[in-house]
Amino acid sequence: MIYKVLYQKDKIVNPRRETTQTLYMEADNMVEARTMVEDNTPYNIELIQELTGNSLTYEKEHADFKLTKFDKK
């Protein structure tokens, strides 16, 4: 499954919508997606959203869509 992860670059600064960034990743489930991001980055995760069907198609066509790869631990 493909997940869209909204995050802040670090956990120290309070989250602001204007500085929210996005990454796309593949994982078996939402828990695994969160674990992989937390284990491999200093990011403050705001939201993880599963992308399927029309949502996935839209993101591929209209966003800077690139899958980020993390090592599973």
Swiss-Prot record:
Function noted in UniProt: A non-essential component of RNA polymerase (RNAP).
Family from the record: Belongs to the RNA polymerase subunit epsilon family.
Gene3D superfamilies xref list: RNAP, epsilon subunit-like
Subunit structure: RNAP is composed of a core of 2 alpha, a beta and a beta' subunit. The core is associated with a delta subunit, and at least one of epsilon or omega. When a sigma factor is associated with the core the holoenzyme is formed, which can initiate transcription.
One GO cellular component, as annotated: DNA-directed RNA polymerase complex
Keyword set, alphabetical order: DNA-directed RNA polymerase, Nucleotidyltransferase, Transcription, Transferase
UniProt-listed Pfam families: RpoY
Name of the protein in its database record: DNA-directed RNA polymerase subunit epsilon
Catalytic reactions of this protein: RNA(n) + a ribonucleoside 5'-triphosphate = RNA(n+1) + diphosphate
NCBIfam families in the record: PRK13667.1
GO biological processes: DNA-templated transcription
Keyword set includes NADP: no
Gene Ontology terms, MF aspect: DNA binding; DNA-directed RNA polymerase activity
Top-rank taxon: Bacteria
